[in-house]
């Protein structure tokens, strides 16, 4: 399984993501830089990591969406390649129109860096197959613009994957760190192959770091790709 980690000027979670994909998960992993182009089916998985691409000028992800590499990312998305946007990567995917909605400044206008509880509301995506529906997990967030908003929430109800919750899985206002509509922490695209989330699974993929709850996202991808491969040769 071949994976790419896209690096923009200002990315700062690319090495963490690369490490998890290559050394924890065993993916054949490569860095792809903002000026690069690639064949749309060259990779099985493309990850846009966290950071502050182009200094978050204008707004988070607004400049990165115009990087040359995003033309290749968009073509890959059209061809069904699995794409994950983590934090700033999620912001870039919304700016590029690959995911619906927008990420705005946190409701309290503060930068949040701490662990949160999340409820897996949809375990039927390529990114959540290893979780149970309704499972409560813990991951780290680190963002100032994670307040997700979309005008027509009913249109994406079945695309909501992760929601902020309390330790018991209750969706409450107090458990929402940034003001996101419906406590949304992660969503998938209409076709289901593009996933954006504000929490950082790469920071929660080894027990040494206090939690390996995020590892199941990458395990789910590996499981999905194996099943797709087996189906193709059946």
Curated annotation (Swiss-Prot):
Which keywords accompany this UniProt record?
ATP-binding, Cytoplasm, Glutamine amidotransferase, Hydrolase, Ligase, Nucleotide-binding, Purine biosynthesis
Assigned EC number? 6.3.5.3, 3.5.1.2
Query: Where does the UniProt annotation place the signal sequence?
Result: none
Q: Where is the Glutamine amidotransferase type-1 domain?
A: 3-231
Location of this chain's protein in the cell: Cytoplasm
The record lists the catalysed reaction(s) as: N(2)-formyl-N(1)-(5-phospho-beta-D-ribosyl)glycinamide + L-glutamine + ATP + H2O = 2-formamido-N(1)-(5-O-phospho-beta-D-ribosyl)acetamidine + L-glutamate + ADP + phosphate + H(+); L-glutamine + H2O = L-glutamate + NH4(+)
Enumerate the PROSITE patterns for this protein: GATASE_TYPE_1 (PS51273)
Keyword Protease among record annotations: no
Question: Mind telling me which InterPro entries this protein's record contains?
Answer: Class_I_gatase-like (IPR029062), PRibForGlyAmidine_synth_PurQ (IPR010075)
Tree of life domain: Bacteria
The GO molecular function terms of this record are: ATP binding; glutaminase activity; phosphoribosylformylglycinamidine synthase activity
Q: Active site annotated at which positions?
A: 87, 200, 202
**SMART domains from the entry?**
GATase_5 (SM01211)
Pfam assignment, any one: GATase_5
- Physiological role: Part of the phosphoribosylformylglycinamidine synthase complex involved in the purines biosynthetic pathway. Catalyzes the ATP-dependent conversion of formylglycinamide ribonucleotide (FGAR) and glutamine to yield formylglycinamidine ribonucleotide (FGAM) and glutamate. The FGAM synthase complex is composed of three subunits. PurQ produces an ammonia molecule by converting glutamine to glutamate. PurL transfers the ammonia molecule to FGAR to form FGAM in an ATP-dependent manner.
Self-association state and partner proteins as the record states? Part of the FGAM synthase complex composed of 1 PurL, 1 PurQ and 2 PurS subunits.
Q: What is this protein called?
A: Phosphoribosylformylglycinamidine synthase subunit PurQ
């Amino acid at each position: 399984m071949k994976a790419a980690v896209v690096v923009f000027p200002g990315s700062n979670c690319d090495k963490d993501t690369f490490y998890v994909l290559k050394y924890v998960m065993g993916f054949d992993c490569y860095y792809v830089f903002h000026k690069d182009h690639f064949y749309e089916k060259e990779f099985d998985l493309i990850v846009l990591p966290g950071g502050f691409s182009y200094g978050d000028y204008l707004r988070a992800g607004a400049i990165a969406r115009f990087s040359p590499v995003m033309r290749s990312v968009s073509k890959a998305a059209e061809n069904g390649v699995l794409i994950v946007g983590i934090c700033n990567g999620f912001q870039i995917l919304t700016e590029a129109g690959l995911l619906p909605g927008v990420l705005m400044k946190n409701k309290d206008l503060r930068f949040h860096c701490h662990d949160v509880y999340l409820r897996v509301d949809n375990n039927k995506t390529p990114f959540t197959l290893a979780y149970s529906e309704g499972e409560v997990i813990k991951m780290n967030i680190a963002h100032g613009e994670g307040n997700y908003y979309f005008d027509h929430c009913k249109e994406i109800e079945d695309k909501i994957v992760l929601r902020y919750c309390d330790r018991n899985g209750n969706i409450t206002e107090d458990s929402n760190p940034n003001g996101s509509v419906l406590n949304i922490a992660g969503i998938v695209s209409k076709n289901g192959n593009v996933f954006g989330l504000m929490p950082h699974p790469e920071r929660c993929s080894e027990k040494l770091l206090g939690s390996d709850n995020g590892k199941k996202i990458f395990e789910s991808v590996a499981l999905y790709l194996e099943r797709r491969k087996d189906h193709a040769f059946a």
